[in-house]
Curated annotation (Swiss-Prot):
It catalyses: an N-acyl-D-glucosamine 6-phosphate = an N-acyl-D-mannosamine 6-phosphate. It holds the Pfam family NanE. Keywords: Carbohydrate metabolism, Isomerase. This is Putative N-acetylmannosamine-6-phosphate 2-epimerase.
Length: 232
């Protein structure tokens, strides 16, 4: 299937939908590929039309989840914890493409990448590998730049996680709204600190084509803490 057909099919499939991020960092009780694969399958059973995964579980998580679920997989690696670390290099993009992901997610901020590449070069590598690419951005300006560079999906994933924008308590709705104004024709995904259905509904209302939720759905520790805090 050529890229244009892939893109059109995914846009139709994901418009107005919830994508679930299934990840766990090193040291987390859920940091086990087998466990996260079952979590991803449960999310699909619950209606998730796509899964975002990989992160510190890397290619092993992507391969395992891609083999288990029959929905598109947005794959990424996390390499380190400072600067650009989400699928940060051309080699990282190629590796995710070869792991079975449908879409590769990569940092599209204006910060320097470890291999000196530009985001536009990552787009080229992804497309040459036969895979679509999602831009993880921190500011509306980065969303615009990534869209111009050829990203198939643009997102607010990193809003509040770089020095260019303060971290909001919940989702950065202003970032999402401003990004929508700058890229009216892009497939814009809201991500980052969406923790309840009201957040998701508001994100859609102000212009997101789809919303990604992770921790609030897939982290039992976070969910338990939300309930426990009401009783203390």
């Amino acid at each position: 299937m050529d890229l244009n057909t892939q893109r059109s099919k995914l846009y139709a499939q994901l418009q107005g939908q919830l994508i679930v991020s299934v990840q766990a960092p090193d040291g987390h009780a859920m940091r086990d590929t087998h466990t996260l694969t079952h979590v991803a399958a449960a999310c699909v059973d619950g209606g998730a039309p796509a899964i975002r995964c990989g992160g510190y579980g890397g290619l092993e998580d992507i391969r395992s989840i891609s083999n288990r679920v029959d929905v598109p997989v947005f794959g990424l690696t996390k390499e380190g914890s400072e600067g650009v670390y989400i699928t940060p290099t051309r080699d990282s993009v190629r590796a995710v493409a070869e792991s079975g992901a449908t879409v590769v997610c990569a940092d599209a901020t204006f910060r320097p990448r470890p291999d000196g590449s530009t985001f536009a070069e990552l787009v080229t590598v992804a497309h040459d590998s036969g895979i679509l690419i999602m831009a993880d951005c921190a500011t509306p300006e980065e969303v615009l730049s990534a869209h111009k560079a050829g990203a198939d999906f643009v997102s607010t994933t990193l809003a509040g996680y770089t020095e260019h924008r303060e971290k909001t308590v919940g989702p950065d709705f202003d970032c999402l709204r401003e990004a929508r104004e700058l890229v009216p024709d892009a497939f814009l995904i809201g991500e980052g600190r969406f923790s309840n259905p009201a957040d998701v509904a508001h994100g859609r209302l102000i212009g997101a084509n789809a919303i990604i939720v992770g921790t609030a759905i897939t982290d039992p520790g976070f969910i338990t803490g939300q309930f426990a805090s009401l009783l203390h």
